[in-house]
Amino acid sequence: VTLEYYADKKREYKSEPACYLGTVGSNANQIDWRVIEHPTGTARYRMAGINTKVDGKDMLVFIGGSTNPYNYNGVGYNGTASEPDSKVWVFSPGEKRWLTAADTTPVMDLRSLIEIDGEVYSVGGMTSGQQVSGKLIKHPIKLQ
């Protein structure tokens, strides 16, 4: 999310569809960041990611979020209620490309994902209708 400032009206929060891949070398305090292609061109706000194995290969998996940046109550900075996204984005570091995966349970306002016995879960967040959830939600990762 970026901020746009105007002389004649209130600032606006704008989505920024951007992806970066960082490589850590021998100095762990330095990361070489590179821009990589965005999988859709539409940014997601407060999604979460995890490094996990998918079909036996290391993958970066991103789940949930919303296309409308929002405040703590799930209402967008633009005054419109935000809804969670069901898309799953999978990036293959080995192939340096995005892969298509099946949708999952829509959830937003995530801080992280966890892995238990090879399965990916979100903890809490918000579900449809800006409902705060304390549930553990399993997200099967199925490449298409």
Predicted regions and their residues:
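Kelch-like beta-propeller repeat domains
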Residues: 1-144
